[in-house]
From Swiss-Prot:
Protein name per Swiss-Prot or TrEMBL: Outer membrane protein B
Lineage: Bacteria, Pseudomonadati, Pseudomonadota, Alphaproteobacteria, Rickettsiales
Top-rank taxon: Bacteria
Chain ranges of the Autotransporter domain: 1355-1643
Impact noted for substituting residue 257 to A: In strain: Breinl
Alphabetized Gene3D superfamilies for the sequence: Autotransporter beta-domain (2.40.128.130)
Organism: Rickettsia prowazekii (strain Madrid E)
Length: 1643
């Protein structure tokens, strides 16, 4: 046991003090106590434990009683325990008397047995302030058999038999003499509630008000009510006290009376008080105050044997368990009941944890007031089914029903708080029921909203009233009364069904209701289809944002009046079951129009959603459901009218309409998705779409509107209300001739998609009435007829098939609004139906009427008039074959387009000849109609003015006879044929004078004798026909208006030679007129400022071009006949104008324009045949247009003839004006008259002049050698670069192209190479000067201080050292002497090793690395050169006679040079693009210098060193070839470059500067470098194919340069040197800056 270690500690400390002479039997094994002997002491007189008197001591002896002795009371004498902290094993009653035992000192006893004298007892008196501690320790057989008395004789206890632990059978009354006396149970072998240590009925308490009862170890059951009178009862952790006792009076046991208290000690507060209700004993426990508290104490009421009651003495409204504050609760409260035995708690219960357990099913617990386990508290149901009834608001905390069929009953208006779980061990076991009698609430005890309030079998609303639920519930909701209402708070989740099983008390379910205060979820079915199990109402929260999510498959409402109510602000029902078909047997009641949402968007195509009820209100006071979203389900709207503002259909979803009235304001669906099904009904064939319904939309049409399988009445009629629109890909039927559309409500409707177009599944009929306009957008098929009545309009946008179209009241209109060609298919009829008022063509698409069937004798449509309106300009209407034009009225309001784009609507007639007479209405002056022959029939026009043109649908078809002209009143028609290239009429005949205000497009046109035709006008000016002038004698005339466009194949012929006239009234394209054998009488051009394009030959007795400008459009145009007059420009293009015969006179305004195409060699010519003569004075300017794209890579002169037969040209051409177009700018043109008197055009190569001029005007004009290089470039005409240059169109581009090739950067690069090597030499010279300065004794006067002298002397001790000098140089050379400048940046480092070979000689070696980037400037800007150099040097310094010295170096440098030079390339279109010519070559530079100097102390601390010497450098590039360009890579051959320089200058060293241990040596210097000899190499470069090389540009850099610089050397010790320096170099148009660092390590 957990208490044993403490107990052992007590007995070990207490068992050492005894004072007795009795025999001792050890009560323990000796292991724990360390006892060597076991004693038994018997009484023979009044005995105490302080001495041996009264015990079985030896004669004359007074032996103290040993610790842990068994005292066997075998004499009728009292026993007094006077030993302080006395510890005896036990008391054994072995006399037939009750014995008195007095506790005068704290005493511990084990067993107290009367096993030998069972009717007798020890009666204890505990003195004031003393403790009787009972451990219940027993003894074993071995111990009982081996005890010895005080004489050490074997004396068995109980005959050697064992005495069980916790044998307190001999315990009688306990009298507390005075306060505070203590009785303590501290059992060595602790007992439990299941097997307690039971004190018999003789164990009583006397004067309990003076005493304290401590239960420190063990579970004690008392049988006498006197224990309740103990002043203080203390129960330690895990220990217990059980009252199974006699009552105080009338079955009642009073606890904590008169200030008595029952306390629960210990850290955990797990001590337990058990109150047992038992027949013949106490059944009611009346508690003064409260039991437990401060989260301590477990109190159990056990009524397993008989019903019992726990009562608060202050009344039920007072706490009986714990108190109502955070820490005031008891640790636990347990109620144990059994079948039929009720437990009643009449008082408030505040316990942290509560247990309801029933030994067998049927136990009942009634709480007559509050039950509250507090935050984090628990309630557990155990063992068997039970029932709990509460009467006040209660908190059961986390409640575990333990998988028992347990019920909690909540009375009217009360709140039950908790989190109720059917089975903690298995969440799937949803046991337990919570039943509300009427009004009430069930709320969570947890602050975590994610913790379920219930996970049980059911929550029941048994009576009329409102049960409020919140949080998460995994339970069935059951309604037991028509007035029962579950009210769900916002966020409530019911994870279970509603009204599926009978109530707990087997009462039947009732049609109660559910009311929502916010969003909620119900996952199970609602109602089970039974009359009483169906719900009456579900009322949603009055909040549009709140959602009721239903996951059940059956949402069953009452058969009559069952409704889901959407309040004023709507709300949402969301159906979430994705596995089963769903049935909603409710009306959906809408309070405010366009509110409420039913969201079934998660349903799949495998599910059917059936709504058996009305939705909203359709008729008066319309109230629509804001949205019904069916997801992808198959939805059936059944058993009621439906009003929906938005119907949402997801992919493949469908909605079935079942012969009610449906208002669906808007359908939302993905394009081409969703289906509406019109169901069949044997009793009712009508389904009505209420006014304002829209199925689908233009942007997102439905997939299908479908008429289901027919019923007994065969047809299904869809009555379509006012303004209803049907948008679907297809409107279909399952059976042929089933499905009719009736539009009888007025307004305008749209029907989209294919209607009834499936093979064998045509719809039945279509009816329009009552002023309704219906527009069909797709192909439409009705097997029956189409009726248009009551001034209704049927608008057709696509192919339309019906038996016939009729209007019984002659008020119907058929309007075509199609944008593409369509066909209307009708059946021929046996008799006419009602005639339409009119047929209107409003769209741009053509319409063809096609009639089928051979039985009928009349047409399937008839109309009073045809009218073209709106967008029908240019639209063709093909009348049913056999319909003549004779009596038709054809109107138009669409005009005829613009002046430059005449157009007209068209009526096509076929299969019959027609005649048009005066008075027949066809078009008007502002609205011309086009009549077209669709077959080889004829039209005879007798009307004087026909506001129409006539054309044909195919070539060589149709005959037109025009006879409407009258004397002095020519007939008028608006065109015969459409335009050039369109089908030609077969024959047109003019029998009277006519004005044709359009084109003539026909195979043959005959103008009868003495008839004049004027043709061309607003309807067209094209001419593509053969006109025959005259029917017999040829005296006919044709006149062409301005802007006549004759097809080149058209012609005008005369019946007889020299008869008939042709007149052009304005600009014209002219084709063939007359023939060599039959010329016409005259051809005249009478317009002003006009021109004629001649496409064919003209043969006429007289040709007068007037002042027309002529353009020759055919390769050869012949002018023949008698005389020809020309007084305008002749533009030959590249064609020939041939004067075949006769005399041509050119007036003063005559000029010639010709075009030379050099690439083909074609030039426009005038050819004067031998039988012809041209007379002219000096003509105007001769314009020569030249298209010259040919290559100019030719030499000499090319010639082209302009006038052939010049000997027959009597006149002089005007001075030429050359207009050269094309890419060739390198040729020169002239016009000459050769020895044959022909006029000839010459073409001469002019490349050298063009290039020289272009370069002279460019930036390189003054560049040295550029003129020579240009000449060499142009001499090499076989190079690719030369030929590419000839593609140039702009002379400035030519200069750029040539300049990039003819100039170079070699001089600059060579100069930089030499300069880079010289920089390294300068660094070596500087190094030598520094060494000499630091190490030479002659400089000691400059040291300036002791410290300086020491430092200087240190250098003398250094034999060698390593140094490094990194540097950075920037240099800029401006343009000089015509040579482009450059900018160079050099970075590098020189690393050297030097040593003092002797006192007067220093030598060293160095290696250097440099990197130079050159950016060339001026006309070479964009060119770049990179140089990477590696140098090797030897250097030294020799001290000569005093103060004189010599120093020098030798250097060898290898440079890797990479150049990028800009070159150019011309595309074939003359566009110039940039290319890069890349060079990659090696350079070698070497040389050396020798300089002499003298050290001179000019003044104290100043050393002046004048110096002079010579330097020599030589450089050489390897030969290389550039890469990277198309035509401009050059091959470069180089020679050596060298340079000899004179160097003169001086250095000045000042006094050292000492900073702590650092010495600084300052220095300044200046030098002049003058080039005394040497030259740059003359590099030669050539392009591929070039014979003479380009010469390189000369060296124009300055010969003299100037340097000034300063430096400082720093020494911190003898081992390390540092330095910094700056140099500035300057020459003519040249500057350079260089910075240097230095570090040296001396060894």
């Amino acid at each position: 046991m957990a208490q044993k270690p403490n107990f052992l500690k007590k007995i070990i400390s207490a068992g050492l003090v005894t004072a007795s002479t009795a025999t001792i039997v050890a009560g323990f094994s000796g292991v724990a106590m360390g006892a060597a002997m076991q004693y038994n002491r018997t009484t023979n007189a009044a005995a105490t434990t302080f001495d041996g008197i009264g015990f079985d001591q030896a004669a004359g002896a007074n032996i103290p009683v040993a610790p842990n002795s068994v005292i066997t009371a075998n004499a009728n004498n009292p026993i007094t325990f006077n030993t302080p902290n006395g510890h005896l094993n036990s008391l054994f009653l072995d006399t037939a008397n009750d014995l008195a035992v007095t506790i005068n000192e704290d005493t511990t006893l084990g067993f107290i047995t009367n096993i030998a004298q069972q009717a007798k007892f020890f009666n204890f008196t505990v003195a004031a302030g003393k403790i009787l501690n009972i451990t219940g320790q027993g003894i074993t057989v071995q111990e009982a058999s081996n005890t010895i008395n005080a004489q050490n004789a074997l004396t068995k206890v109980h005959g050697g038999a064992a005495i069980n632990a916790n044998d307190l059978s001999g315990l009688g009354s306990i009298t507390f003499a005075a306060a505070p006396s203590v009785l303590e149970f501290n059992l060595i072998n602790p007992t439990t509630q299941e097997a307690p240590l039971t004190l018999g009925a003789n164990s009583k308490i006397v004067n309990g008000g003076n005493g304290t009862l401590n239960i420190t170890n063990g579970f004690i059951q008392v049988s006498d009510n006197t224990f309740a009178g103990i002043k203080t009862i203390n129960i330690d952790d895990c220990q217990g006290l059980m009252f199974n006792s006699t009552p105080d009076a009338a079955n009642t046991l009073n606890l904590q009376v008169g200030g008595n208290t029952i306390n629960f000690n210990g850290i955990d507060g797990t001590g337990k008080l058990v109150l047992v209700s038992k027949n013949g004993a106490a059944t009611e426990f009346n508690v003064t105050g409260t039991l437990g508290g401060n989260l301590k104490g477990i109190i159990e009421l056990n009524t397993a044997a008989v019903a019992g009651k726990l009562i608060s003495q202050g009344g039920a409204a007072n706490a009986v368990i714990g108190t109502d504050n955070g820490a005031g609760r008891a640790a636990g409260f347990i109620v144990s009941v059994d079948n039929g035995n009720a437990a009643t708690i009449s008082g408030q219960v505040y316990a942290k944890n509560m247990v309801i357990q029933s030994a067998n099913a049927g136990g009942q617990v009634t709480f007559e007031h509050i039950v509250d386990v507090g935050l984090g508290g628990t309630t557990n149901f155990k063992t068997a089914d039970s029932k709990v009834i509460i009467t006040e608001n209660s908190n059961f905390g986390s409640t575990n029903f333990g998988n028992l069929d347990t019920q909690i009953v909540v009375p009217d208006t009360k709140i039950l708080k908790g989190n109720f779980i059917g089975d903690v061990k298995n969440n799937g076991n949803t046991a337990g029921v919570i039943t509300f009698n009427a009004n009430g609430a069930l709320v969570s005890a947890s602050t975590d909203p994610n913790i379920a309030v219930t996970n049980i079998n059911a929550i029941e609303a048994e009576g009329a009233g409102v049960v409020e639920l919140s949080g998460i519930h995994i339970a069935e909701l059951r309604l037991g009364n028509g007035g029962s209402i579950f009210k769900l708070a916002d966020g409530t989740v019911i994870n279970g069904p509603v009204n599926q099983n009978a109530l707990m008390n087997n009462n039947a379910l009732a049609a109660g209701s559910i009311q929502l205060d916010g969003s909620a979820i119900i996952t199970g079915d609602i109602g089970n289809g039974g009359v009483n199990a169906a719900l009456q109402h579900i009322t949603l929260a009055n909040d549009a944002s709140k959602i009721l999510a239903l996951d059940g498959a059956n949402i069953i409402g009452a058969n009559v009046g069952g409704a889901i109510h959407f309040q004023a602000n709507g709300g949402t029902i969301k159906l979430t079951n994705t596995q089963n078909n769903i049935v909603v047997n409710f009306d959906l009641d809408i309070t405010t129009d366009k509110t409420g949402v039913v969201d079934a968007s998660s349903l799949t195509n495998n599910q059917t959603l059936t709504i058996n009820g009305s939705i909203g209100t359709v008729v008066a006071n319309t109230k629509t459901l804001a949205q019904l979203n069916i997801g992808s389900s198959k939805t059936i709207l059944n058993a009621g009218d439906v009003a929906i503002n938005e119907l949402v259909i997801e992919n493949n979803g469908s909605v079935q309409l079942n012969h009610n009235t449906y208002l669906i304001t808007k359908t939302i669906n993905a394009a081409n998705q969703g289906q509406i099904i019109v169901a069949a009904d044997p009793l009712n064939t009508n389904t009505t779409l209420a006014d304002g319904t829209n199925l689908g939309s233009a942007e997102n049409p439905l997939s299908t509107i479908h008429f289901a399988t027919k019923a007994a009445n065969a047809d299904s009629i869809l009555n379509v209300g006012k303004g209803v629109n049907l948008y679907a890909n297809n409107i279909t039927t399952n059976d042929a001739n089933v499905g009719s559309l009736h539009f009888r409500s007025g307004g305008t409707s749209i029907v989209s998609g294919t209607v009834g177009g499936q093979q064998g599944h045509k719809l039945n009929n279509l009816i329009l009435d009552n002023g309704t306009t219906v527009k069909f957008l797709g192909d439409t098929t009705f097997n029956g007829g189409t009726k248009i009545e009551g001034k209704s309009i049927l608008q057709i946008s696509n192919n339309y098939t019906t038996d016939h179209v009729e209007s019984a009241d002659n008020t119907g209109t058929l309007e075509f609004v199609n944008t593409d060609p369509i066909t209307v298919t009708l059946n021929k009829q046996g008799a006419y139906f009602g005639v339409l008022k009119q047929v209107i063509i409003s769209g741009p698409g053509n319409i063809v009427f096609n009639e089928i069937g051979n039985v009928g004798i009349v047409h399937g449509i008839a109309a009073n008039s045809i009218s073209f309106e709106n967008a029908s300009l240019g639209t063709s209407l093909f009348l049913p074959s056999g319909t003549p034009l004779d009596v038709l009225t054809i109107k138009s309001t669409v005009g005829n387009g613009t002046v430059d784009n005449f157009n007209a609507p068209i009526v096509v007639v076929s299969g019959i000849d027609s005649m048009i007479n005066n008075g027949q209405i066809i078009g008007d002056k502002k609205n011309i109609i086009a009549l077209s022959l669709g077959s080889d029939n004829s039209i005879t026009v007798n009307a004087n003015t026909l506001y129409s043109g006539i054309r044909t649908t195919k070539n060589n078809q149709g005959t037109v006879t025009l006879s409407g002209g009258m004397p002095n009143n020519p007939g008028t028609i608006y065109g015969l044929g459409l335009e050039n290239g369109s089908p030609k009429l077969k024959q047109v005949t003019f029998t009277t004078d006519y004005n044709n205000l359009g084109s003539i497009i026909a195979n043959n046109v005959t103008i009868n004798d003495y008839v004049t035709l004027t043709t061309g006008g607003i309807a067209g000016t094209d001419f593509d026909a053969k006109i025959t002038l005259g029917s017999v004698n040829g005296n006919a005339n044709v006149r062409f208006v301005d802007s006549t466009f004759s097809d080149p194949r058209s012609m005008i012929v005369a019946t007889q030679a020299n008869k008939g006239t042709v007149t052009y009234l304005g600009n014209a394209l002219v084709s063939n007129i007359g023939s060599l054998d039959t010329p016409v009488a005259s051809v005249r051009f009478t317009g002003n400022d006009s021109g004629a394009g001649l496409q064919g030959n003209i043969y006429s007795q007289n040709i007068d071009f007037g002042t027309y400008n002529l353009t020759i459009l055919n390769s050869n145009v012949i002018l023949g006949g008698g005389t020809t007059a020309i007084n305008g420009e002749i533009d030959l293009l590249t064609n020939n104008l041939i004067f075949a015969n006769g005399t041509s006179t050119w007036g003063d305004n005559t000029s010639i324009s010709t075009t030379l195409n050099v690439s083909s060699g074609n030039i426009g010519q005038v050819v004067i045949a031998e039988d012809a003569q041209v007379n002219a004075t000096t003509t105007g300017t001769t314009t020569i247009k030249i298209q010259d794209n040919a290559n100019a890579n030719f030499s000499g002169t090319q010639a082209y003839t302009l006038i052939q037969g010049g000997a027959r040209f009597n006149g002089t051409l005007g001075a030429p004006n050359f207009a050269v177009t094309g890419s060739n700018i390198f040729v020169k043109y002239e016009l000459i008259r050769d020895s044959n008197q022909d006029y000839v055009l010459t073409r001469t190569n002019d490349v050298l002049n063009v290039v020289t001029t272009a370069v002279g005007n460019s930036a390189i004009a003054n560049a040295p050698g550029v003129s020579q290089n240009i000449s060499r470039c142009l001499e090499s005409t076989n190079t690719a670069a030369y030929n590419n240059m000839l593609l140039a169109k702009d002379p400035s581009d030519v200069a750029t192209f040539v300049g990039a090739i003819a100039t170079d950067t070699s001089a600059a690069v060579t100069t930089v190479n030499l300069n880079d090597t010289q920089k390294t030499q300068d660094l070596l010279s500087n190094r030598l000067g520094t060494l000499r300065y630091l190490s030479n004794a002659e400089t000691s006067d400059v040291a300036g201080s002791a410290t300086g002298a020491v430092s200087s002397g240190d250098e003398a001790e250094v034999s060698y050292g390593v140094w490094a000098k990194p540097f950075y140089n920037i240099a800029e050379q401006d343009k000089k002497g015509g040579i482009a400048g450059y900018k160079a940046k050099t970075t590098g480092v020189v690393v050297g090793l030097d040593t003092l070979a002797s006192d007067n000689l220093m030598i060293g070696a160095a290696i250097g690395i440099t990197k130079t980037d050159i950016k060339h400037q001026d006309y070479k800007k964009g060119d770049k050169t990179d140089i990477n150099g590696l140098s090797f040097s030897l250097y030294g310094s020799q001290q000569l006679v005093k103060n004189f010295f010599a120093q020098g170096n030798a250097i060898f440098t290898l440079n890797k040079v990479k150049s990028k030079s800009q070159r150019y390339f011309f595309e074939s279109n003359g566009k110039m693009s940039k290319q890069i010519a890349a060079g990659n070559y090696d350079n070698m530079t070497f040389g050396g210098n020798l300089i002499f100097g003298y050290d001179y102390n000019a003044m104290p601390n100043v050393l002046v060193t004048p110096m002079a010497g010579l330097s020599y450098l030589k450089s050489s590039n390897e030969n290389y070839k550039e890469t990277g360009t198309t035509v401009a890579n050059k091959r470069i051959n180089s020679k050596f470059s060298d340079r000899v320089d004179l160097i003169v200058g001086a250095k000045v060293a000042g006094s050292t500067v000492n900073i702590t241990d650092i010495v600084i040596y300052p220095e300044i210097h200046s030098f002049v470098v003058h080039k005394v000899n040497g030259k740059l190499s003359n590099s030669q470069s050539m392009l591929d194919g070039q014979t003479a090389p380009f010469i390189s540009q000369p060296d124009r850099t300055a010969k003299t340069s100037y340097n000034i610089g300063l430096s400082a050397n720093i020494k911190s010790d003898a081992k390390m040197e540092y330095g910094i320096g700056y140099d500035f170099n300057s020459a003519s148009k040249y500057t350079a800056h260089q910075g240097t660092l230095k570090v040296r390590v001396n060894f």
